[in-house]
């Protein structure tokens, strides 16, 4: 079969990542404006960036000072190529110093919510926004003079140049972070850059994503076959549905029952997903294999990598069986990898490896499959929209996120069958009560964690007990890059706690995790 032509690339905004905490959020905000965005490292040569033919470029914030030795730099060429550029925070200061402006280390630091005074209300970025507006600052250096040819459009009480514009060269910058919700009119300012400054039209949709991926998948797979691991979660389900739309019966889904799933998960996969898609499904019972491999292991990184390794080995076995049954080569493995997975596994410049995800950093080096990752550049909310567009039912699309390694990384300590059964019971109670209270759509997810290596004293009945604590970790988020703990009603928390301590053996304490992300990740391991 001849190869299909490469999918036409949409107008693309490049987000240059200087190691900013919010670099991924910038990309997401651009996409919310229905313009496609991609992230590139600041170490990429400018010529290589321009070779991507970007419709616009955004320079992210970053932790460095523009005067620090070894601080990220950019070739001046990026500002002279005729491509619209928007600098934020560090990107703003880098634009200023590169083009002849002045940035000083004045000691006048601004962190958090700050009043911005707009002096040019009719400017490209600020038209239609208030003259006084709260913005989110995070900087130590300050711009005291704009480059020649730039108009200063805003200031703060301590920073004389908090925003500037050069409409002729289509160069714009702000000292603050317009991408965070604390900058009340930040999205409007960003859209003004995209639509007015860069002249882009809001045309990127989930339909575009589906069409592009279908074409790319068909080109990649050709006449060969693919298998996809279904985990019971949203990501793998949407990835499988998207690949099936592209190659139909050339896809076989494999559900690995590794014994680390929640209560009723296997039955739900067989019932909901197969009924919705009609996909070919092979179920593999691998509980004993996984528990044997995890025996005696408490280190979370080691657990993740063992689960990733065994997952692939089971797939290789399933591959051989599918070939024996159906003939053509199974050369591809479909994975529901998302943008945050890649970032947290060290995929962004200037960012640390927070944890290895089983479908990113946890794969063995001798992997025998070529990967298909149709969701790799999408955030969770975008994945849900793609799922809805593909016709998947709400029972699948609106499910709360659940990690591929399953309950194996919600047990702090060694994973055993007894501990899994205990955690399954507690998790089922929490999910049941959250659903009964109508809170499923109010929270992003609620991991239930067993502190298996910890015991606490309790009193149950007339006797002293020495049982395990269970941790509830309800969080609210838009994309899993940042999260806040959810303020659940006390009555709901009380019901969950009472039921768990009454109904689950060896648990005598339920605690609530009230940590945001950062500093804590959503999952405990």
UniProtKB/Swiss-Prot annotation:
This is GMP synthase [glutamine-hydrolyzing]. HAMAP family: GMP_synthase. ATP binds at residues 231-237. The active site is at residues 89, 177, 179. Residues 204-399 form the GMPS ATP-PPase domain. GO terms for cellular component: cytosol. GO terms for molecular function: ATP binding; GMP synthase activity. It is an enzyme of class 6 (ligase). Its EC number is 6.3.5.2. Homodimer. Catalyzes the synthesis of GMP from XMP. Pathway: Purine metabolism; GMP biosynthesis; GMP from XMP (L-Gln route): step 1/1. It catalyses: XMP + L-glutamine + ATP + H2O = GMP + L-glutamate + AMP + diphosphate + 2 H(+). Keywords: ATP-binding, Glutamine amidotransferase, GMP biosynthesis, Ligase, Nucleotide-binding, Purine biosynthesis. It comes from Streptomyces avermitilis (strain ATCC 31267 / DSM 46492 / JCM 5070 / NBRC 14893 / NCIMB 12804 / NRRL 8165 / MA-4680). Pfam families: GATase, GMP_synt_C, NAD_synthase. Gene3D superfamilies: 3.30.300.10, 3.40.50.880, HUPs (3.40.50.620). Residues 12-203 form the Glutamine amidotransferase type-1 domain.
